[in-house]
UniProtKB/Swiss-Prot annotation:
Keywords: Glycoprotein, Secreted, Signal. Glycans are attached at N75. Transmembrane segments: none annotated. It comes from the Eukaryota. PANTHER family: PROTEIN, PUTATIVE (AFU_ORTHOLOGUE AFUA_6G03560)-RELATED. Disulfide bonds: none annotated. Residues 1-17 form the signal peptide. This is Uncharacterized secreted protein ARB_07637.
Amino acid sequence: MKASLITAFVLPLLALASPYLPTDPPANIEVTARHPGRENVDKLPMQAAGRAFWLGGSPATYCPEIVGDNCPPGNATVILGLNSMSVLVPGGQQMYVEPSGKLGFTQAHSAAIPPGSYVGGFAYKPLNKKSGSFYFGGWGATALMACPVPDSKYYQVFANIKNAMVPGGDVKKCVEFVGVAKEYKGTTPAAWQYT
């Protein structure tokens, strides 16, 4: 009798007390690399520049003069709905992964994507109440990786796909990282366009 009372009343109360983890990502996220012990990538923000993604530095953005004071700040790389950039430019900017594994985004005013690229496939897994893991889950990938670029101080972001074609050609020099996604609380859209 006592065991059935515990099962009937106590266990449901314990379930209610357990921490709730949201399964849906926030609409607008910023991503920061986490790989403790690898200071060359750990805690660096993922930035959009040159139609690619990088760790560190600043985003490359543009806003036409005619927009004037209505230009979004353009000082953060913000992802909208996991698969596109948080931009005001008509038509938006979609994200993709090239056959090489390189993460990229479309040029403003164009839907052109490199042949063979994977559109979609970006995912979010809750880590706690305030953040989640942002990653690419297509083509057998399970994480993101930062790859050194010859003659650059920045690391370029790739999906950890088999046979990735990375700058310098040596995938062993790349560093896998957890893309920690947190809600962006600034002005949205975050930029007119990323360049």
